[in-house]
From Swiss-Prot:
This is Chaperone protein DnaJ. It comes from Wolbachia pipientis subsp. Culex pipiens (strain wPip). Binds 2 Zn(2+) ions per monomer. Belongs to the DnaJ family. Residues 5-70 form the J domain. One of its GO terms (biological process) is DNA replication. GO terms for cellular component: cytoplasm. Keywords: Chaperone, Cytoplasm, DNA replication, Metal-binding, Repeat, Stress response, Zinc, Zinc-finger. Its main location: cytoplasm. The gene is dnaJ.
């Protein structure tokens, strides 16, 4: 998944100081906050983007990793996006909980449990034939899955978590600094609002463990290079009962030996004899589905000419229709080493006739030039 540059999102240079980054974020966060743009999905998405950028660039370690390795370095080596994160947590560090309705939950007991898992990306390479017919692709990857001992709760046995005394179950801590009220995530319960007294020995209280996942993903026919197939709930498991993220399978199509692709159309180059190009005829070629088709070559076909075979290309996504196949003919020059004596004599005779014809045309042409 393509990600925007964090410095560009915050409209700062790569040498910007921490204070400059904070000021830039504050300005943009106020501009795009959902409470100031009700119903504006574009503004909401922009708010999430600048908040994600600030979360990385305001942290010296994450910023160093991002500067060196890009988005992978900022996320600890994994290529995922934390789509389920609560961006208002970071926003509240600047403005407290009184900006608007979307941050009011920080003043009351948390109604949600756990932390949502991250979305994951998996690059899958398939053949053009696979993309033509569609396949069930077996894939495997390693991620955090739900702990089967505690069933994702993080607690050992039937003992339930208790309310955090530090934040009184809100998951947030407020501190007064002059005229400003600063609100931050509770460092005792890490924003959960509750404490696990008897942690699961298998997962250490996180509710998840590291393991390999094996699944089969349906790749539809007609899929194009770079397309993403979303597998709901197959991303990283949420912590302590949180919602699992999604898996995005990014399709890469291997280069084909014969065909090139442009959307649903296919293109190929086919060499033909000089005599066939002159006299016309038919050639047999094999289409992407393995079937043989006859392609008519008109008389006098020149090298580079494209012959169209309707509905012999790739299928359109979610449709029974197909694109076209374009056959570009390449007229081969005869090699005298591969010709018989009779063939050479016939070519010489043809050349003599052609030479006389060309001379007559040349004389007529230059005669017109002289008259002018």
């Amino acid at each position: 998944m393509n990600k925007k540059d964090y410095y560009d999102l915050l409209e700062v240079s790569r040498n910007a100081s921490t204070d400059e980054i904070k000021k830039a974020y504050k300005k943009l966060a106020l501009k795009y906050h959902p409470d100031r743009n009700p119903g504006n999905k574009e503004a909401e998405e922009k708010f999430k983007e600048v908040t994600a950028a600030y979360e990385v660039l305001s942290d010296s370690e994450k910023r160093a990793g991002y500067d060196r390795y890009g988005h992978d370095g900022a996320s600890g080596g994994f290529d995922f996006s934390q789509a389920g994160g609560d961006f208002s947590d970071i926003f509240n560090d600047f403005f407290g909980g009184g900006f608007g309705g979307s941050t009011s939950r920080s003043r009351t007991k948390r109604s949600t449990t756990g932390v949502s898992g991250a979305d994951l990306r998996y690059d899958l390479k398939i053949t053009l034939e696979d993309a033509f017919k569609g396949i069930q692709a077996p894939i495997h990857y390693v991620t955090n899955i739900k702990c089967n001992t505690c069933q994702g709760t993080g607690s050992e046995g039937a003992i339930k978590p208790v309310q955090c005394n530090t934040c009184q179950g809100s998951g947030r801590i407020r501190t007064q600094q002059g005229f400003f009220t600063i609100e931050r995530t509770c460092t005792t319960c890490y924003g959960e609002g509750e404490i696990i007294q008897n942690k699961c020995k298998k997962c250490g209280g996180s509710g998840r463990k590291r393991d390999e996942v094996n699944i089969s993903v349906s790749i539809p026919k007609g899929i194009e290079e770079g397309a993403k197939v979303r597998v709901s709930g197959k991303g990283e498991a949420g912590a302590r009962g949180g919602k699992s993220g999604d898996l995005y399978v990014c399709v890469k199509i291997a280069t084909h030996q014969i065909f090139t692709r442009n959307r649903a159309d296919l293109h190929c180059k086919v060499p033909i004899r000089m005599t066939l190009a002159v006299l016309g005829g038919e050639i047999d070629i094999q289409s992407i589905d393995g079937a043989k088709i006859k392609v008519k070559v008109p008389e006098g076909t020149q090298t580079g000419t494209k012959l169209r075979c309707r509905e012999k290309g790739m299928p359109y996504m979610n449709s029974h229709a197909r694109g076209d196949l374009y056959v570009q003919v390449i007229v081969e020059t005869l090699n005298p080493k591969n010709l018989t004596q009779k063939q050479i004599e016939l070519l010489k005779a043809l050349e003599e006739e052609e030479h006389e014809s060309v001379e007559q045309k040349s004389e007529g042409f230059f005669g017109k030039v002289k008259k002018k």
